[in-house]
Structure formats: structure tokens, C-alpha cells
């Protein structure tokens, strides 16, 4: 089910047009006004997206904080519960606790496991026992209204004891307390203590004496499979894996079968998903040559994004890569290695695509009769025709759905969508909803480097993952704001995929930062979000750009790029062991696989970034809390010495307590407190990735 379907209003709830103004002005003249607020106001529910227009998002295993603002007039105490309905129709109740004193904000964290649509409401109520206890603990010791307070206590205890939902033992304890409170032969203090006994307080906290129950509106949370929100991605071009230059200078393309040999190495680095650029036939007309030149040689392979030729279009496989059988073989080898394959879905066409002659209405025809090619000024893509959705929308969307389902039938369950922000958003909402209605495990990643409103709406419309501007967030201040925003501002609908590089993006930070820059970016991406990714060559420190551009020289989009990973490793020039360490840390530390739990800490250096991730023991398989603290020198050209100042309560340590940290990068251990000295040398190890344990647990 798509996100939008969860809370889309029915036709009856959303008439086609508002009533005329004069009708609206007179229709309630003799009707009593019905307040919008319940008896006890409940406001600002979270998670919710656009007041419930869309279902909020969560992935299986995610710990979701449910929050609401609830209060009542006067000083009487209230209680607040989360009423949570799972996809199977079973409702559970969860007591919410007051947070941030003075804000009337309530919260409870719940780990959502079952995939499907969850619904929740918040119930607020007058907590009669808590109100009585608050008043009695002031009045009784001061000998004010003692008998009245005890009479009220007896009535409350008797009422609670009559609640058949309580256990027999609880009802017995409550009845006995009521009997003691009512016994005027006993002293006032004994009677009072019977009503505030720790056991009675526990019983009436776990199941309060409720009055004036009030309910919020219903909101929905769509829980998707874990891989939709958590994973380590690795991108490679299958044509480069196994490609060879022949004696005559021509190239022999790699195939799915040669590329399959690379999969165990990718899996050994700890990656979960291998993303392939388009695997379809490539057009010849206006084919781009090396480095995006306008003239291609006879043996230049062209850009995989210039889709379509005599051998077919989006439902065809480039003959150099193999056949459908070879692709299925490749998928099988990936599965054996514990990998999923993500396929590129790029809705555009080369001038040679069958669509150009069969469905010219799917493109934009200019006044001179030519078809408009793609442009992103100052870039021009003469080898690519963009799609026009407005001439034959129904025909085009039917064809795209057919294509997606074809690749699904072969075993593809993840699609990386190229430039979705250049296509109509209602189309994506329809496509993703239609696919997920029958195949909820299919995941769509939006490769959309665009304005926040567009990016956010794509996510709300159904995209499970989104590219972000992470690649251009490099300073401490930029990264603090960026990572905090991901964890706090948008997690209800946007799950980021933090790629450190792409075939299109080689930032100046990587171009000129040396090996330290590669470590820094990988460490922050791998620990800052549940999903991250690298494009092949990153582990070889590839950093040479085409002059004047943030793109690689000899870009793999336009030529074959076989790489000698084994030789680089033998020479000690490979980052693969570091990437392996990062993915192992993610595997071993569930806190790193959560999105909403990132907390930024302070340092006295404007280049030292500090953040932690924490997961309480109730949410881990081991039953033990998990805490990881990351301290990064984001200046790849320097040695930084500074003090870091930690809010230790953010990762489960009592204020003032010492704790042990162990560096997953070097294996070193230290005993720390809230304020600590650090030295980070960009020329050796620029990042600490520290596990945190109380001293008694570390021994």
C-alpha cells in the first residue's frame, strides 16, 4: 500500500466543491456549535505527515517515538496512553510519559516490527488517583481535610478493585488497602500509608483510575521491510567488470557473468545492495564519447542513460552484457552472496529508442519538427530525449508499469529512479502505490538533487529512499545541521541514502582532501544514517576530476573502467578494509541502524564534529543498551587537539559517571567522562568511532 492510500479521504468526506458562501454563512444559525476539542485537549500528534494526509513512514525494527501534547484546565493530574493497532488488528496500550517540563508534551517509544499499515490514537484522561495523591501528600501531613482525603482514597481504591481487567492479586491488594483506609479504628497515618504504598502506586500507575477519557484523531504509520530503510549500497557498471582491451585497441565489454565474479568481494566488504546503472541497449545517434565529448568512436560504449536502440528499449538487455538468462544468473549469484540488486529506472530515451517511432507523442516536438533533447543548463544531453507525460498520460503510465513489473518478474525488488523530480509527481504516486499494493517489498530510491519542497513531496508520495545534499555538506556546522535535520525534522517521511560519491559527483572535498577525506566522508555516511552508499573506485581513492567540473576524468558513464582492486590492496592503497570495518560496525551495533536517535554533542574546535547514537536495551536482541560515539576531524589537512563536551545522558550514562570507550578504528580503550581531550590526526586516523559502556559493564 502506498503512503497516500493510508489516509486519503473518501469521496463523501471530500466533496468536489465547497458550499456557496451565502449557504455557509446561514447554515448553522439554529444549530448548536460542536467544539473541535475533546474534553481533555490532545494536539500535535507525532508521527504524522501533513495532518494525516499521508501515512507516516517507519521500517521494520525502527524505534518510533510517539508524541502528543495533552493538558487540562486547573491543576488536576492527567494520564496519556498510546492506543496502537497493528496490521493484524490487535490493539496494544502504551503509557506515555511527560517530557520537557512545562510543555505538556508526552512520549512513548515503540519498536515497530510487523510490516503493513499501523494506526494509532492517543487517549488522555483524568488520573483520579494521581490527583488524589498529589493533594493528599500535601494535606494529610499538614492535618488538613484528613478524613475527607481518606474517604476519597477509599472510594478510589474500591473502584479500582472492582475493575475485572485487573489480575486477581491486584484486586486483592486494592481491596485490602481500601479496607485499611476505611478502618477508623486505625491511625490516620496507617490509613494514609495503605493508600500510598509502593505496591498500590505501581498498580494504579500501570492501570490508572480513569475519568473523562478523551481521544485524538486517528493517524497511520506504514511500516515497510527493513531494507527499505537500512542498507549499505555499492554501485558498479557491469560492463566494466571483466572488460578487456583487445590487441587491436578495441574493448571487449564485461558481461553479467564476469560481473558476477565481483559480487563476493562486494559482499565481503559488508555491503547489502549492488546498484547497477541502466543495463539496456544504448543509442548510436549523438552518442557521447569519452569525457562527454560530442564525437564517439566506433568502439566507444556510450552512456547507459541514453536508453534504446535497434535491440530494444527499457525492457531489453544490452547484448554486450548478455541475455535475460545471464541476468537471472547474475541475480542468483547476488542472492547467494547475500546481496540484493537495485536496477536503474531512467524514464528517458535515446533518439534510437523504439518509442521515438512508435510513440512520438511521448516526447516534446518543437515548432521546427524536431524532438527536444535533455538540457540542464549549461549541460546539454543531445543523446537523450526527455519524456512528455501530458500527451498520452494513460498510455505512458501503463507502459512504465509493464516495464517495472517485467523486471520484478525476473527478481528485481529495488529500483533507483533517475531524476524523478523532472517527471510529474502524481505519476510517481500512482506508480509506487500500484506496485506496492501487490508487492509491498519493492523499494524505490529517488535520485533527486532538487529543492526541499520537491524532494519532500516525492518522499511523501511514496519513494522509500531519497538522495540528499550530503555530498556538499562538509563543515562541522553544515553537518550538524544536516544530520540533525535528518533525525528530527523529516524522519516521518524521508529516509536518506547517503552516497559519498556517484559517477556524476566528485566533490572538491574528495578531489583535494587526500585519503583522509575519503575516510571522513565514509565514516560520517556510514554512521550518520541507516542507509549509505559508495560508487566503485571510491575504495581506490579515485580523485581526479575533469577540469572545471565536479565529475571524474575519463568518466565511466562514457567508457569502460576496469579496476585492479587486488593490486591496490596488495600495495596498501585500498580503502576496502576501512569500508569493511564501517559495515561491520553497522552490523554489530543496532544503534547505527536507526534514524531518529542521532544526538549532536559539543567540541571546542570548529572542525571537530561530535555525535552519538543510542538504543536502549529493551530494543536490542541482546537486551543490552547499545551506544556509539563518533568524533570526526572534518578538516582533512590538519591535526586537531580539543576538548569535547558530552551530554552523557543521551547515550545512557548517568550524569557524573565515568565510562569506557573503545575505538572501533584502532582498538584503543579509554576511560572517559563528560569532558574529554581528543587528538585527531587527519594523516593517520581522522575519526574516532567509539563504543560506550558503563565501567561495570566493560569489566
Role assignments for model-derived ranges:
Residues 229-254, 282-330, 357-394, 553-562:
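Aromatic- and acidic-residue-enriched carbohydrate-binding clefts of CAZyme catalytic domains
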Amino acid at each position: 500500500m502506498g503512503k497516500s492510500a493510508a489516509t486519503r479521504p473518501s469521496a463523501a468526506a471530500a466533496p468536489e466543491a465547497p458550499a456557496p458562501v451565502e449557504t455557509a454563512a446561514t447554515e448553522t444559525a439554529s444549530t448548536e456549535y460542536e467544539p473541535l476539542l475533546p474534553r481533555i485537549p490532545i494536539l500535535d500528534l507525532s508521527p504524522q505527515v501533513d495532518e494525516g494526509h499521508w501515512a507516516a513512514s517507519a521500517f521494520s525494527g525502527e524505534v518510533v517515538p510517539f508524541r502528543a501534547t495533552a493538558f487540562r484546565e486547573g491543576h488536576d493530574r492527567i494520564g496519556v496512553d498510546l492506543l496502537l493497532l497493528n496490521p493484524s488488528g490487535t490493539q496494544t496500550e502504551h503509557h506515555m510519559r511527560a517530557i520537557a517540563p512545562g510543555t505538556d508534551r508526552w512520549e512513548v517509544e515503540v519498536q515497530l516490527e510487523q510490516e503493513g499499515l499501523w494506526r494509532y490514537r492517543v487517549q488522555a484522561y483524568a488520573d483520579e488517583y494521581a490527583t488524589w495523591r498529589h493533594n493528599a501528600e500535601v494535606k494529610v501531613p499538614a492535618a488538613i481535610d484528613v478524613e475527607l482525603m481518606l474517604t476519597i482514597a477509599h472510594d478510589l481504591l474500591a473502584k479500582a478493585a472492582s475493575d475485572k481487567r485487573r489480575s486477581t492479586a491486584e484486586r486483592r491488594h486494592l481491596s485490602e488497602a481500601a479496607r485499611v483506609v476505611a478502618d477508623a479504628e486505625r491511625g490516620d497515618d496507617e490509613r494514609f500509608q495503605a493508600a500510598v504504598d509502593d505496591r498500590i502506586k505501581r498498580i494504579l500507575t500501570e492501570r490508572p483510575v480513569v475519568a473523562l477519557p478523551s481521544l485524538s484523531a486517528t493517524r497511520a504509520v506504514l511500516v515497510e521491510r527493513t531494507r527499505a530503510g537500512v542498507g549499505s549500497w555499492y554501485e558498479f557498471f557491469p560492463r566494466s567488470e571483466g572488460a578487456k582491451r583487445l590487441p587491436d585497441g578495441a574493448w571487449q565489454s564485461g558481461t553479467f557473468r564476469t560481473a558476477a565474479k565481483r559480487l563476493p568481494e562486494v559482499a565481503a566488504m559488508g555491503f547489502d545492495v549492488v546498484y547497477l546503472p541502466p543495463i539496456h541497449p544504448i543509442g548510436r545517434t549523438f552518442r557521447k564519447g569519452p569525457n562527454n565529448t560530442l564525437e564517439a568512436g566506433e568502439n566507444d560504449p556510450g552512456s547507459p542513460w541514453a536508453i534504446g536502440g535497434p535491440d530494444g528499449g527499457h525492457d531489453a538487455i544490452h547484448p554486450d552484457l548478455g541475455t535475460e538468462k545471464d541476468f537471472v544468473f547474475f541475480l542468483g549469484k547476488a542472492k547467494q552472496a547475500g546481496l540484493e540488486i537495485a536496477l536503474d529506472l531512467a524514464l528517458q530515451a535515446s533518439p534510437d529508442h523504439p518509442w521515438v517511432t512508435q510513440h512520438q507523442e511521448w516526447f516534446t516536438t518543437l515548432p521546427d519538427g524536431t524532438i527536444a533533447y535533455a538540457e540542464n543548463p549549461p549541460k546539454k544531453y543531445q543523446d537523450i530525449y526527455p519524456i512528455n507525460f501530458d500527451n498520452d498520460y494513460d498510455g505512458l503510465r501503463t507502459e512504465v508499469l509493464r516495464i517495472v513489473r517485467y523486471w520484478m518478474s525476473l527478481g528485481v525488488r529495488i529500483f533507483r529512479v533517475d531524476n524523478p523530480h523532472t517527471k510529474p509527481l502524481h505519476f510517481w504516486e500512482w506508480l509506487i502505490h500500484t506496485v506496492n499494493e501487490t508487492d509491498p517489498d519493492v523499494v524505490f530510491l529517488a535520485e533527486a538533487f532538487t529543492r526541499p519542497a520537491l524532494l519532500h513531496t516525492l518522499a511523501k508520495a511514496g519513494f522509500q529512499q531519497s538522495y540528499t545534499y550530503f555530498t556538499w555538506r562538509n563543515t562541522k556546522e553544515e553537518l550538524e545541521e544536516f544530520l540533525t535535520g535528518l533525525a528530527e525534522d523529516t524522519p516521518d517521511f524521508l529516509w536518506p541514502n547517503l552516497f559519498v560519491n556517484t559517477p556524476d559527483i566528485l566533490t572538491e572535498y574528495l578531489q583535494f582532501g587526500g585519503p583522509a577525506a575519503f575516510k571522513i566522508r565514509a565514516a560520517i555516511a556510514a554512521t550518520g544514517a541507516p542507509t549509505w552508499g559508495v560508487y566503485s573506485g571510491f575504495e581506490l581513492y579515485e580523485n581526479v576530476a575533469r577540469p572545471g567540473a565536479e565529475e571524474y576524468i575519463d568518466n565511466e558513464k562514457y567508457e569502460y573502467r576496469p579496476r585492479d582492486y587486488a593490486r591496490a590492496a596488495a600495495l596498501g592503497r585500498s580503502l576496502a578494509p576501512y569500508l569493511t570495518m564501517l559495515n561491520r560496525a553497522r552490523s554489530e551495533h543496532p544503534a547505527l541502524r536507526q534514524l531518529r536517535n542521532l544526538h549532536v554533542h559539543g567540541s571546542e574546535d570548529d572542525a571537530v564534529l561530535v555525535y552519538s547514537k543510542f538504543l536502549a536495551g529493551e530494543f536490542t536482541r541482546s537486551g543490552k543498551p547499545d551506544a556509539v560515539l563518533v568524533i570526526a576531524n572534518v578538516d582533512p589537512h590538519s591535526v586537531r587537539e580539543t576538548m569535547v563536551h558530552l551530554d552523557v545522558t543521551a547515550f545512557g550514562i548517568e550524569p557524573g559517571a565515568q565510562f569506557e570507550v573503545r575505538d572501533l578504528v584502532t582498538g584503543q580503550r579509554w576511560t572517559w567522562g563528560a569532558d574529554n581531550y581528543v587528538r585527531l590526526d587527519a594523516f593517520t586516523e581522522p575519526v574516532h568511532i567509539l563504543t560506550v559502556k558503563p565501567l561495570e559493564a566493560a569489566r
